[in-house]
């Protein structure tokens, strides 16, 4: 199996909603959080859905390549579910922007968060030392992440990620009838780390239009081999993908950056 490490950098404010919680207090719509640590994340199902939508509507990706990566569900004439060849993991928050007196904002993290990500990569067979991750984040931070001052205490990072510190934005009625709800967002420039796992190639069976006879309802098929790394890299590396809610008001536009592939 091949594996690739990706950074996801929010270019606009991001709201990937948590539908499994009921609102208490001011916040009506909360963001997704890691069920163990409470640190913001993007669940793998939400990430896969957003990437699939981008591959379908925006990317110049063949139908057979999309089938190889994402699979397909039953419906719309498809009789059975076909499993995709790519495994998607949760995107973990690695860098959070906070206000700064000198540079408007700076990016912060904590050692525990980075250690946890390095540990996951190691368990999945990717040797990626802590120092290499830090250097990659410095590059991704474009001058706003200082490895000497940006790695803060875990308790302080948790406080920055808490409901009390993350932005909450009022969504107003277009008819001027007042606020409809209050939703939590992650500020733009937040950086996540994720992992994709896939075989070198996947064979998919598709309809062969050149040999099918629609009059006699005779459907011929053909098998196509898809180079997974080539298809994934071409579709997503250095591309901007919309993730989460509120696309029509500019939320959730994120850059995908491939960091390493093994």
Describe the predicted segments one by one:
Residues 1-262:
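RNA-binding basic/glycine-rich loop and surface signature characteristic of RAMP-family CRISPR effectors
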């Amino acid at each position: 199996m091949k594996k690739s490490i990706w950074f996801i950098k929010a270019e606009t404010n991001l709201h990937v909603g948590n539908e499994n919680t009921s609102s208490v207090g001011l916040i009506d719509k909360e963001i997704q959080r890691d069920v163990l640590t409470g640190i913001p994340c993007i669940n793998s199902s939400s990430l896969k859905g957003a990437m699939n939508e981008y591959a379908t509507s925006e990317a110049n990706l063949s139908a057979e390549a999309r089938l190889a990566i994402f699979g397909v569900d039953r419906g719309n004439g498809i009789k059975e579910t076909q499993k995709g060849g790519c495994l998607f993991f949760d995107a973990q928050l690695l860098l959070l922007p906070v206000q700064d007196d000198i540079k408007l904002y700076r990016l912060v993290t904590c050692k525990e968060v980075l250690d946890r990500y390095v540990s996951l990569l190691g368990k999945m067979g990717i040797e990626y030392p802590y120092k290499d991750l830090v250097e990659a984040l410095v590059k991704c931070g474009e001058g706003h992440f200082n490895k000497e001052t940006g790695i803060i205490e875990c308790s302080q990072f948790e406080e920055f990620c808490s409901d009390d510190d993350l932005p909450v934005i009022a969504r107003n009625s277009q008819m001027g009838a007042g606020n409809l709800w209050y939703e939590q967002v992650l500020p733009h420039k937040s950086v996540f780390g994720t992992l994709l796992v896939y075989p070198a190639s996947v064979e998919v069976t598709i309809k062969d239009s050149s040999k099918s006879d629609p009059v006699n309802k005779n459907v011929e098929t053909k098998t196509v081999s898809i180079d997974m790394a080539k298809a994934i890299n071409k579709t997503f590396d250095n591309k901007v993908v919309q993730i989460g809610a509120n696309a029509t008001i500019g939320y959730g536009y994120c850059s995908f950056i491939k960091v390493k592939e093994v």
